[in-house]
Amino acid sequence: MNIMKMMKQVQQMQAGLAAAQEKLASQTVTTEGAGGKLKVTATCDGNLTELVIDPSIIDPSDSEFLQELLLQTINAAIAKGKETAAAEMKKLTGGLDLPPGMGF
């Protein structure tokens, strides 16, 4: 394979990855907990953008319950975002399993 052609392909892939990163920074995923009474929205690059808590699940005498629900739902949103990001990157890299940190 011609080295110039290979370099051009690498540049195209880098441009595609940069565009995908921008897209993922604005693409959101939402998860729900507590039977829909807790909703967390996050970008696919891991930033939380919305947290909705139904007042009916707030019990001042049992704050640990709410803390646990929040952690579970936030972690689920982050995991869902990572899965979405990984699927998008896999499309761009043609299924190559690149190590973490390689351009993302």
Swiss-Prot record:
A GO term from the CC aspect: bacterial nucleoid
Keyword match DNA-binding: yes
InterPro entries tied to this protein: YbaB-like_sf (IPR036894), YbaB/EbfC (IPR004401)
Name by which UniProt lists this protein: Nucleoid-associated protein Amuc_1227
Subunit details: Homodimer.
Top-level taxonomic group: Bacteria
Function in brief: Binds to DNA and alters its conformation. May be involved in regulation of gene expression, nucleoid organization and DNA protection.
Similarity comment: Belongs to the YbaB/EbfC family.
Key word Cytoplasm present: yes
GO molecular function: DNA binding
Keywords for the protein's UniProt record, in alphabetical order: Cytoplasm, DNA-binding
